[in-house]
Amino acid sequence: MTKTKNTGGALEALVRKRLPDYKAEGLALEQNSPRFAGKVGPRGKAQGRLVSKGGLDFSGHFWGRAVTFDCKSTEGKSFPLNERNVKPHQARRLREAHEMGAIAFFLVEFSELAEGPRYFVLDWPVLAPYWEAVDRARNVGGKAPASIPLDVFKRSCTAIVRDKGGLDLVAVIAGMAEKMEVKR
């Protein structure tokens, strides 16, 4: 059984550690801010609650190309496709961004792996057949994959190595941008 926790909060922190470096190098990724809903109470005090953000964890630009991604973390040897882990609006946003020419992906951590790479870039072309099966099953019935096995990540996704400064996504994003240019 594959368990999920905060689905990526600690991973977000690793990425955030590198944001000042990206900015200093002329690369900027901005984290989406959560939205508040509520009203102004007596004496002008805001009363409200935090509502979930509508987009993905990070968005911005890399050398003139739009980039958007969401951080996910899982225990075990597969990436669950349940709604707790991947919300339909997140997959939709990833697909739409990809179709518009953006670099769009899930940054997935396999938190319990003892050896080998544990961070992978799951881009839309790899995710699409799995997510479309989940979406089809949700809408018209049928069987859908419950998760994407680790072997698929090792075979089809780019691995990222963690260093002292966190996770460096620059080389990965540059490689994805190059591949996209070749396909045009």
Write out the residue ranges for each language-model feature.
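Charged phosphate-binding loop/patch that engages nucleotide di/tri-phosphates or the phosphate backbone
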Residues: L150-R184
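Conserved catalytic cores of phosphodiester-cleaving nucleases, focusing on short active-site segments
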Residues: F58-G60, G64-G76
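Acidic-basic catalytic patches of nuclease active cores, encompassing PD-(D/E)XK
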Residues: M1-R49, K183-R184
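Nucleic-acid nuclease catalytic cores
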Residues: R95-P129
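Basic/aromatic recognition patch in beta-strand/loop cores that engages polyanionic ligands
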Residues: V51-L56, H61, R95
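Mg2+/Mn2+-dependent nuclease catalytic core
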Residues: T74-R93, H98-M100
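Short, electropositive alpha-helical surface patch
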Residues: P117-P149
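Short, solvent-exposed loop/turn segments at secondary-structure junctions
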Residues: F36-V40, G76-F79, L113-E115
